[in-house]
C-alpha cells in the first residue's frame, strides 16, 4: 500500500519564516498553499517551516488557511494541542535527520543503529499504551544515494517487522490524535 500526504514546507528551504510582518507572511502562506493545492489536487493539512522557523503569528495564519498541524516543534515524541484553537504539534526529530547525521560523518551502519536505538526506547516509553512518534527526516539527495540505499532498506525492514510500529503519515498521526 502506498502511504503519502503532502506537507507544506515553504516556497524554498532558503527563505526562512522569521522576521515577516503579518500581512507579508499571510500572503506568502496563501501563495504556497495555493501552489501545493494546484499541483497535488489536495490542500495540505500540515506545515513545516523552512529550517523549522516561524513567527509569533504563523500558527494562527496557518489555522486560518485550513492547516491542522505543524511539525516545527521538536520538543516531544507525542502530538499535543497548540494554544491556537484546532492546531496541533506533530513530532519531528532533528536527531534523526539524514542530512545532519551524514553531514556529521555518521556511516550507513551507524544510521541503522541510531534508528533501532530510537525505536527501542520509544517502544519502551509507549509500553503504557500511550504511543510515540519516531519521525525520520529524509532527503532524497542524501538517503537516496546509491551507496546508502541498502542501509535505508535495512531501516525500513526493521521498522516494518515491529508488531507495535505503525508506518504512517503525519496527516494520519494528527487525525488519530484528534480521534482519541
Q: Predicted segment positions?
A:
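Short, small-residue-biased leader/transition segments that mark boundaries at the very start
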Residues: 1-2
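Hydrophobic faces of well-ordered beta-strands that scaffold small-molecule active sites
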Residues: 6-9, 45-47, 69-71, 88-90, ...
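Active-site-proximal loop/turn and secondary-structure-junction residues that shape catalytic pockets
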Residues: 10-14, 51-53, 75, 94-96, ...
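Short, solvent-exposed loop/turn segments at secondary-structure boundaries
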Residues: 18-23, 102-103, 145-149
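Active-site-adjacent pocket scaffolds in enzyme catalytic domains
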Residues: 34-38, 42-129
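C-terminal domain-boundary segment and adjacent tail
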Residues: 69, 116-180
